């Protein structure tokens, strides 16, 4: 079955093709479809539904959409749903002029903002742990993925999953050629590697997106 992916990100297409090998995963770009919906949601799930519904209205076919991002405990969950637009401490939700920031620069700014928060001495590790934060120390961070498989405007299966880790202390320590986004600075203590250093199979097994996709598969196994 042909399933449209509401993204032109080639890395996401590869991941979804590996998780749904029995289906043909097609992006808007593959078929020359202009697709750039405005993501106005305040949650990952809201944004994934915005994208899925927008592409379904164009194609009339099943659509997979996800919205993902990284949240840093010590920064109150920043950048969260604005991860792709994050532009430093002054522009958590993106620059007012809409200018895109290179990923390497975003990585450096996020590490810098966290380092400044830690250096300020205002963070309370014990209190944070009581709130379920800092499971991996003051540098704790997690990825979230909200994924939907939409077959009608109001007919969809949804799953939300996370992957926990820490941020590296210096952008110069960023490493790994796999993955994308903040993966080169997202360290996984249990693996001793960044998310970008994992093989595709390793990442799909533990990542927020891989876990969400498998939940979707289980929900709609008969599709």
What spans do the regions from the language model cover?
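Anionic-ligand binding patches
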Residues: 2-4, 11-223
